Amino acid sequence: YQNNAQTLGKLLLLARRLCEAGCGFVTITTRFVWDMHGDQNNLGMQQGMAAVGRPFDHAVSAFIEDCQARGLGDDILLVSTGEMGRTPRINKNGGRDHWGGLTPLLVYGGGIRGGQVVGQSTRDGSKPLTAPCNSRNLLGTLMAQLFDIGELRIKQGLPTDLVRYVSSATPIQFD
């Protein structure tokens, strides 16, 4: 847990430097262990969040502050998400299990006004209360931030399935 969590800040610093140097797209994958089932292979919630939650918060906050200070807030789009959420209730081992009903998503920059909460869950966090955002909406958001979708439709040589999928994906509605 600890060694994996210590690398994110360095990776985000490298990503910012690559963007400043003109790189148009940087992908970071972490080896963070968000599985906090509280079983023989995984930490429980309290230990797990101490091991990865705090370092994640620190690294991402420092990255955002660094980008803002350098005037890169509109030029860099940070997206942080996982493939699933966690159960609304803590299990008998003090952990949480996989949950497909809701997934956290953090978006920063790219001209999107910060401080927004988009969507709402039920009080117990088990399912969406408002219209859910899905992977297609996320892809639509990324493509709308990166490309002029109208121009993309008329480009020669692009796979028609990709263009059709991207142009039909509704971006997440931010204020």
List each language-model region with its residue ranges:
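Ligand-binding pockets and gating/stacking loops
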Residues: Y1-D175
